[in-house]
């Protein structure tokens, strides 16, 4: 995929992410607690669900972003229990890249290790919000690996948003829309994402404190 095509595809993904962020309709809350809310609605991208997580994280937007950013130097693999490794396959620009992420087994090994190959665009907005915008792609240097089930991320990512009057807090809104592939009971998938997203926020809070506290 050349730069022009990648830019066009990634901009379309980023626009979808903005639509998800702005559209308040159709969301059903499936998990709440510790200041974090997880909701879902049916995906229009694949026969599954789009999940939204919302929570306030103690830390500046820059600190939170350093922990979650899908860029070189990210701290993500050091704290996120759902990420074994994150590697940049190819950087097209400072904010546009191809990545490969591997995840461990989960739900008492009912979900075996996965890998995901994505095109990622980072956007910065005038109000200081930083967003990551990702979707699955194929890349010649990353054919399927027999050690992993290849999963597919449909438009997903996060928004790190400053809180007016609260410089040391960040509103983090996340969107997950993942086809885990393999032969998984839908009940396993439906229970996994809300629980793992709630855990993501709890672990992120600890990570910001550990790395920047």
Curated annotation (Swiss-Prot):
InterPro entries: StARD5/6 (IPR043556), START-like_dom_sf (IPR023393), START_lipid-bd_dom (IPR002913)
Any GO molecular function: cholesterol transfer activity
Residues in START domain copies: 1-213
Origin: domain of life: Eukaryota
Coiled coil: none
Record keywords, A-Z: Lipid transport, Lipid-binding, Transport
Alphabetized Pfam families for the sequence: START
Gene Ontology BP terms: cholesterol import
Chain's role: May be involved in the intracellular transport of sterols or other lipids. May bind cholesterol or other sterols.
Record's protein name: StAR-related lipid transfer protein 5
Upper taxonomic lineage: Eukaryota, Metazoa, Chordata, Craniata, Vertebrata
Record gene name: STARD5
């Amino acid at each position: 995929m050349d730069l022009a095509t990648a830019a066009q595809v990634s901009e379309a993904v980023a626009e979808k992410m903005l639509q998800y962020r702005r559209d308040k309709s159709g969301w059903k809350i499936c998990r709440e607690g510790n200041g974090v809310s997880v909701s879902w609605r049916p995906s229009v991208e694949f026969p599954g669900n789009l999940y939204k997580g919302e929570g306030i994280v103690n830390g500046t937007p820059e600190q939170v972003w350093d922990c979650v950013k899908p860029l070189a130097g990210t701290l993500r693999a050091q704290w996120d229990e759902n990420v074994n490794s994150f590697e940049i396959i190819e950087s097209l620009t400072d904010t546009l890249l191809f990545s490969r992420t591997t995840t461990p087994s989960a739900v008492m090994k009912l979900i075996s290790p996965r890998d995901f190959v994505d095109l990622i665009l980072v956007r910065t907005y005038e109000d200081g919000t930083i967003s990551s915008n990702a979707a699955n792609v194929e890349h010649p240097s990353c054919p399927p690996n027999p050690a992993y089930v290849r999963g597919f991320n449909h438009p997903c990512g996060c928004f790190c948003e400053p809180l007016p009057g609260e410089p040391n807090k960040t509103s983090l809104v996340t969107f997950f829309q993942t086809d885990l592939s393999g032969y998984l009971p839908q009940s396993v998938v439906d229970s996994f994402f809300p629980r793992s997203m709630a855990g993501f926020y709890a672990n992120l809070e600890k990570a910001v404190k550990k790395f920047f506290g």
